[in-house]
Amino acid sequence: ESRGLGDVYKRQALMVCDKPGAFVNERAARYGIPTFTFNPKEYPSKADYEREIVRRLRAERVELICLAGYMRILSDVVLEAYRDRIVNIHPSLLPAFKGAHAIADAFAYGVKVFGVTIHYVNGELDGGRIIAQRAFEYLGSDPEELEARVHAVEHPLYVETVAKLVAEQ
């Protein structure tokens, strides 16, 4: 819920969420953003719910997909429909510390320079082409404080990066 998105919010056509009770649904409603919320368990297969996602995205003429907190690996159903048009945010300086526990893994490893990466999504976990990165030094010893610092860096970077991508379209 970063400020300063301007035209990015105005152009957002659809918010897709795989968690029916998630607070992000309320946020989207507050901004007047249409939402497709689904429960993956209600579909016979991953391919079925991903086909429905693609159908809805196409119906809204979505050109760019921006993932945030979507903790599922996208299959070729979505990747082929939106090749080079899906971006994700990751809480490490990729290619280091891929996966869902990047902050904890980097902290446990003793890293002193942390960061955030915005990247295109491809078939490899956190393996797409890097669009933007921002690093910062952290010498503290509190993992919760580190996580808060990561989020303080990633939100503005994602807003800036998405705004640039939208402006280029």
What are these regions (language model features)?
Residues 4, 31-32, 82:
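Short, structured coil segments at secondary-structure junctions
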Residues 18, 64, 68-169:
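Donor/substrate-binding cores of folate-linked one-carbon enzymes
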